[in-house]
C-alpha cells in the first residue's frame, strides 16, 4: 500500500502546497481521498489517469476539500473513463454532487453532443453517504470510516485503510478527538492535519484574533498533535493540511517530537510513502 500526498495545503492558495487530497494505491486499487485545488494536475504529474481511479472518498464538504470535484469528473471523461464514478462521503454529498452537475449541465451536454466521444459513463455518479461508522471493501482494500470532530461542520470523517496486514489512518479535518485516537490505535502510519501555533498573525479587521481563535478551535494545534500520535501509538506520524502553509519546519518538528517521542514527517506535495 502506498500513500501519495497530492495536496498538503489549506484554503489559502500556495504554489507549493495544493489543496487537500491524497492517493492510496495498491497493486490493484486506486482510491482518492478529497479533491482539493490542483488535484488533477498532481495526478497528471504522477502519470495517474483520472480514468483509473476506483473511488473518491470525501472527509467532509468544506470547499478546500471538494473545490476541484467537477474538474476531476470532466477530466476523467477527457481521459476516456469508461466506468461510472463511485463517491463516498458525508450526509450532504448527494445534494452537493447533484448541484455541481446541474450547474455545468448545459455546457456538458453541448460538449457531449458536439465532441461525440464514445462513452459518457464518467458522468454516471453513484454516491454513498456515510453513517457514523462502517466498512467498505473495494478490491484489495478495506476502508473503515469513523466520525471526527470538526464542529461546526456537522459531518466529518477519518478513514482507516487496510491492506496485507498494514493500516493507514487519515484524520481528515478535526480538533483533538478521542474517536480518532481510538480508531488510529497502532496504525502503521497516521496522516494528521495540523494548525501551527504562533505562525499566523492577526491583520487588522481582515484576520482578527477572534478569527484565528475560531480557526484553531476546529483544527488540531501543533502543541497537541504529538500527544494525539502518542496516545494513538502510531508507528509513523505524517503531518499535512498545514495552517499556515509557510512555517518554521525545525520548530514544528521540535514541538511535535517533544510529545510524540519521535520526529514527525513533514508532508509535502507528491511525497510517496510505502506502508
Language-model features and meaning:
Residues 165-169, 175-271:
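Cap/insert and terminal regions of metallo-dependent hydrolase folds
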Residues 1-180, 251-274:
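Binuclear metal-dependent hydrolase catalytic cores
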Amino acid at each position: 500500500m502506498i500513500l501519495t500526498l497530492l495536496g498538503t495545503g489549506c484554503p489559502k492558495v500556495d504554489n507549493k502546497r495544493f489543496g487537500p487530497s491524497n492517493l492510496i494505491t495498491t497493486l490493484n486499487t486506486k482510491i482518492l481521498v478529497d479533491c482539493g485545488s490542483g488535484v488533477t494536475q498532481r495526478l497528471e504529474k504522477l502519470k495517474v489517469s483520472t480514468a483509473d481511479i476506483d473511488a473518491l472518498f470525501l472527509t467532509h464538504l468544506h470547499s478546500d476539500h471538494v473545490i476541484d470535484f467537477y474538474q476531476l469528473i470532466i477530466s476523467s471523461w477527457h481521459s476516456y473513463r469508461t466506468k461510472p464514478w463511485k463517491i463516498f462521503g458525508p450526509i450532504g454529498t448527494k445534494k452537493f454532487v447533484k448541484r455541481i452537475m446541474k450547474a455545468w449541465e448545459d455546457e456538458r451536454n453541448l460538449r457531449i453532443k458536439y465532441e461525440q466521444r464514445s462513452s459518457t459513463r464518467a458522468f454516471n455518479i453513484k454516491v454513498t453517504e456515510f453513517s457514523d461508522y462502517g466498512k467498505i471493501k473495494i478490491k484489495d482494500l478495506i476502508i473503515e470510516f469513523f466520525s471526527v470532530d470538526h464542529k461546526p461542520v456537522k459531518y466529518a470523517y477519518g478513514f482507516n485503510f487496510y491492506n496485507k496486514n498494514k493500516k493507514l489512518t487519515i484524520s481528515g479535518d478535526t480538533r483533538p478527538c478521542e474517536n480518532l485516537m481510538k480508531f488510529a490505535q497502532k496504525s502503521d502510519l497516521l496522516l494528521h492535519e495540523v494548525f501551527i501555533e504562533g505562525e499566523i498573525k492577526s491583520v487588522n479587521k481582515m484576520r482578527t484574533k477572534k478569527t484565528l481563535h475560531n480557526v484553531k478551535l476546529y483544527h488540531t494545534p501543533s502543541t497537541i498533535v504529538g500527544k494525539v500520535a502518542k496516545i494513538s501509538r502510531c508507528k509513523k506520524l505524517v503531518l499535512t493540511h498545514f495552517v499556515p502553509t509557510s512555517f518554521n519546519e525545525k520548530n514544528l518538528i521540535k514541538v511535535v517530537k517533544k510529545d510524540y517521542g519521535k520526529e514527525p514527517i513533514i508532508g509535502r506535495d507528491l511525497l510517496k510513502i510505502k506502508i
